[in-house]
Structures are given as structure tokens and as C-alpha cells.
């Protein structure tokens, strides 16, 4: 298929709603882990990597929270404790409040 077409539904990228439908079906968990030397890492998990572009989401979250981070498997890890604002920011990105669990 051409690069302007969605590989899932076959519609042009401008008309594709596959990612929005995928967002509605996911259960997202947000938690804070302590790593070496007492550093805190916010872990956001529960994404379906085949439906959501995790690297694009990671870039968006890193710019919103002004921190570093990475994508590991189906999780996004951000440096620091961002538990308080994470639900609000994910809702801005199109996820519903019922899907997000702290």
C-alpha cells in the first residue's frame, strides 16, 4: 500500500479513525517506581503498540512534562514523578478518564 493509506482499514490517513478506536479499547495504568539512587520514574503501561504510535506519544509526554523518557516494550517511562498531571495530559491526547487508572 502507499504511504498515504492506513494499513489497518485501507482509508487515507486523513480519514482513518483506527487510532481513536484503539484508544477507546485500552486500559492504561500509571504508576511511579523508584530506581537506583532513589530516582523516581513514571511508568505508563497498557498500550497496544500495534495500534498506538508509542514513540510519538512518548515525544508528546516528554515535551509536556519537560523531562527525559523512553519507550520499553508497550510502556512509556518518564523520568521523575508525574503522577499528579498524567491523567489530565492523557485526556488532552484523546484517552478517556475511565481508561486511566493511577
Curated annotation (Swiss-Prot):
CDD domains: YciH_like (cd11567). Keywords: Protein biosynthesis, Translation regulation. Signal peptide: none annotated. PROSITE patterns: SUI1 (PS50296). It holds the Pfam family SUI1. One of its GO terms (molecular function) is mRNA binding. One of its GO terms (biological process) is formation of translation preinitiation complex. InterPro entries: DENR/SUI1_TIF (IPR050318), SUI1 (IPR001950), SUI1_arc (IPR022851), SUI1_arc_bac (IPR005872), SUI1_dom_sf (IPR036877). Belongs to the SUI1 family. NCBIfam families: PRK00939.1, SUI1_rel. This is Protein translation factor SUI1 homolog.
